[in-house]
């Protein structure tokens, strides 16, 4: 089997990349391991009178479908409403799919044996012919394998990082290494709130990864708003400024790291971190 057989880009995503249209990668660890599989009504934070709901627009939530499936469908719909083609990444039958269609999404959503795949797991899962949801790190690798061009923007909820108690047990997510080595812009609501966020920021600094707050000077805390005492190194206030940064970082200066664009969770959807 050739490398091209191990990673396949859907025709929709490939056409968009060939035409130079906007493509946003989406991960599937949230589908396989992040949220419940049973059917549930639409969260109130996705109602049209909330900011997140307005982004999704007229997406009709199917309350009879698995919650994890509808969650990813809603995220993909938000990408389309914003003018981008969503490239949902996941593994089916040992093939890393870049641009899952709805039937493939549904298949992965209901598979209770699906694996959670980081970069270390991809090769073995491919050999095993496994199904799996991709983490931030694995999805960034998939972005680099997309054809005919790489995908430069990836949206997710929050990155992994340095866990609390790292002084006793050095539990550090592979997401940080991926950010240091894969030139992809990761748009996320900062780092997951369960982490040592200050240590995560220090690690990103040591790895040479730019962290920019999108419309904020404070570090976002995933679902919990922002950390009032933890500042981000840089701030941008519009998408064109992000594009200019990426062009300078990658194309003008040839720096081959990722960039973390820290976009806070909408205030009307944030929860108390305590």
Tell me what each language-model feature is:
Residues 28, 33-35, 39-65, 69-125, ...:
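Glycine-rich nucleotide/cofactor/substrate-binding loop typically near the N-terminus or early
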Residues 21-35, 156, 161:
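Amphipathic alpha-helical packing elements
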Residues 1-20:
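N- or domain-start disorder-to-order transition segments that initiate the globular core
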Residues 23, 86-98, 176-274:
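A structural signal for small-residue-enriched, beta-sheet-centric alpha/beta enzyme cores
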Residues 42-43, 104-107, 172-173, 228-233:
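Short, hinge-like loop/turn segments at secondary-structure boundaries
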Residues 6, 10, 40, 64-75, ...:
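Generic structural signal for well-ordered, non-membrane alpha-helical segments
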Residues 14-18, 22-24, 81, 142-148, ...:
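Solvent-exposed alpha-helices and their adjacent loops that cap or buttress functional pockets
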Residues 94-183:
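Divalent-metal (Mg2+/Mn2+/Ca2+)-assisted nucleotide/phosphate chemistry catalytic cores
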């Amino acid at each position: 089997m050739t490398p091209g057989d191990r990673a396949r880009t859907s025709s929709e995503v490939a056409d968009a990349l060939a035409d130079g249209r906007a493509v946003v990668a989406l991960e599937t660890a949230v589908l396989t391991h992040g949220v419940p599989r049973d059917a549930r009504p639409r969260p109130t934070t996705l109602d049209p009178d909330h900011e997140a709901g307005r982004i999704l627009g007229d997406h009709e939530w199917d309350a009879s479908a698995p919650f994890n499936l509808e969650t990813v469908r809603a995220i993909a719909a938000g990408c389309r409403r914003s003018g981008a083609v969503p490239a949902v990444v996941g593994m089916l039958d040992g093939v890393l799919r870049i641009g899952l269609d709805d039937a493939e999404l549904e298949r992965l959503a209901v598979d209770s044996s699906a694996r959670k795949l980081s970069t270390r797991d991809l090769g073995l899962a491919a050999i095993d012919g496994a199904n799996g949801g991709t983490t931030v790190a694995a999805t960034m690798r998939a972005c680099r394998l997309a054809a005919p061009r790489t995908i430069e923007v990836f949206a997710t909820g929050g990155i992994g990082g340095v866990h609390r108690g790292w002084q006793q047990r050095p539990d550090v997510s592979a997401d940080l290494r991926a950010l240091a080595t894969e030139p992809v812009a990761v748009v996320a609501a900062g780092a997951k709130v369960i982490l040592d966020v200050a240590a995560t920021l220090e690690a990103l600094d040591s790895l040479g990864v730019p962290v920019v707050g999108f419309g904020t000077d404070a570090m976002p805390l995933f679902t919990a708003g922002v950390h009032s005492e933890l500042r981000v190194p840089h701030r941008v206030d519009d998408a064109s400024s992000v594009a200019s940064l990426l062009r300078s970082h990658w194309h003008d200066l040839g720096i081959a790291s990722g960039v973390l664009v820290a976009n806070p969770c909408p205030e009307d959807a944030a929860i108390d971190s305590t």
